[in-house]
């Protein structure tokens, strides 16, 4: 049963609904809450004239006309008929206007209403539910199923419905099911884009462009029932303006419900869109046989209304009102006439809205947190990349440094390998390394010597402080002993005075007074015994210290014996050690300490003897007192205590005897150690030169010695020839001088003496060198041979007195010059003899110690012995030459007068002796064995020639 179109007969308020919806959208913007919305005063009329004019311009069909009462009655009858038939045929269609959204719903008349009663039409505010209940309106019979609304959704949700077409709806009491829903009016409007949720959509949902009529469903007759689902959309048509041309007023209930519906619709739109799409995909269009629904906003609104409050729908019965909305402002199903919602529904809606707001806030916070996490992740990634880049750069720098170090080490390694190969091929020794090592060794020796001196100083200070402490202790003990002795003497004087005064008739008090001194004596003896015990303990400690020192000295002596061997045994091969100066200093220091300790012990022994004598005297006195008063029982006790004291004194005497013996043993041991130290001093003095040579130097010295042997063999022959020539020249010179100037002739005795001297010299030359004595050691100055030669120089008395001297002054001056030059030459020869003798002794020591290095063979030993014999013969010839020179000087003796003491000028005789001196110097230099001795000799001879 189709319902006739009523678009032309709609009141003016229905035409004014789009403008009202737009105004309400401005009053209630998106996102505003119910608490912030302003309630308008009910006394102020709404601007209906302006809205009516706007709606009239938009509506093509009589928009400004009013429905008369007859028309309303016809509409009510038609609605009643539709309700009756709708229960049988299907859900009545809620008429929708297409295009611009001039959507109207047929108002449903409640059951039992008077036919002439005024019913709310499209655009008018819905009456409250209480008034409808008072009128006795009842709900229609069988409920309609909500899915029928969803079946009218078109296949394409975004397409607008065709102009003038109406879709079948699910509203109660609608027109005939499946009727043509075309309208007379309804200006077409373009549909909004998909997903657009602006103010226009909400305005179109409220009223559409042509006004949205609210189709009120009849409420239940009982006042306690809650309104159906259609009552939630009861305020959807409020924005339509006043009915007719009169000014309608706002009511508080309508405004509150409208605000609630506005916010609820706004919240449900998003959730309903997804459900609509799912229903559209699954199956739609079974009920929409006449025309498709105008777009996704209608489906969203329908689903939102259907699923908003299922509990309310179950409470009030199977009643539903269909609601739809066009895409361009579409049609909505009319709400029931009860516009006042129930308080429970309002509370549920508020709770749902609060939950939605909370969820939104949580979503916003989660979004913000996600954004922050993303930024943090980006920052962490950037920092990680930066750190990786920095680490990579550092690793590159470290790799470069390591490469540089490797190159440097490779260069050094190659250099060292080259040096090693060169040394292996040529056998050369790195002189620079040896010099650096020698320098380091010298520095280390200097530092060790300096530290040793400092240690000696500290040790001396320590010993001095210990001595002072011991002296102070001894003085303290002496003072204590003197104090005790004075006290004893005072007590003895008191006893004597009491004995002189006393008699047998003395009172008991005096007897007690006599007995007290003996007790005091006993106490004094006990104190003295305590002191003696302390002294004995001190002596024991010192004896323990001395025993430790003795053990240490014995251990060191054993070390020296194992290191150097006994005096009678030959030198060990592995001889080594520090310089003898440091060893001597250490031994001297230890010897000094032992001597000081021995002196201290001796003093203590003397003091103990004095104390023992004093104690013995006191004991004798006490014994006499014991014999005098033996009858008394107190004296018996005192005698027992005295016997104990005697035993202690006997023990102390035994300890003192023991200490005396120990001190005597220590003194003997110290003497023995000093004797051994002196022996080691003499022994170690001859081996200092050999310790400073290492294997490398010995090899070099052996090569130098081989070269020196050849030169010595060559020079020895030359020296012998030159000596012979010198003798001949000297004899000729002497004869010539004596014949020309002095006229002296040698006597046969002189010739015999000379021949005897020559024989002795030849005998000395033929003898082997004396190898018992090894030259000057320690404090000795020269060798015995040099001293004997100097002592055996002929005196002036052996030669006859010269004859008369020539009287000429020039001859006498020449003789003086010759004598002075001869004396100078004699001095130089003496020095050369002394130096050569020391060199020979050093060479002998080196030969004797050659086995230390294990480098001497039998052939080398024999060649060295021959070489030393040759040097010995040269030295003997020099001594013989010195003798001849002395005889010549004695023969040339001229008495010196005061007038002749002037400056001496050298003559040509010195030029004759200079080649001999140079040859001797060369011989000595090439026969030396160490660079230090060569340096010393060169320095001496240069100093001699300079002077």
Curated annotation (Swiss-Prot):
Record's compositionally biased regions (Basic and acidic residues): 141-151, 355-368, 496-513, 747-768
Protein localization: Membrane
Any matching Pfam family: SOGA
Transmembrane region(s): 915-935
Disordered: annotated segments: 1-251, 266-368, 496-524, 743-786
Record-level GO BP terms: regulation of autophagy
Topology with respect to the bilayer: Single-pass membrane protein
Keywords: Coiled coil, Membrane, Phosphoprotein, Signal, Transmembrane, Transmembrane helix
GO cellular component, one term: membrane
Source species, domain of life: Eukaryota
Nuclease keyword on record: no
InterPro entries hit by this protein: MTCL1-3 (IPR049885), SOGA_CC (IPR027881)
Family: Belongs to the MTCL family.
Identification of the protein by name: Microtubule cross-linking factor 3
Species, as recorded: Homo sapiens (Human)
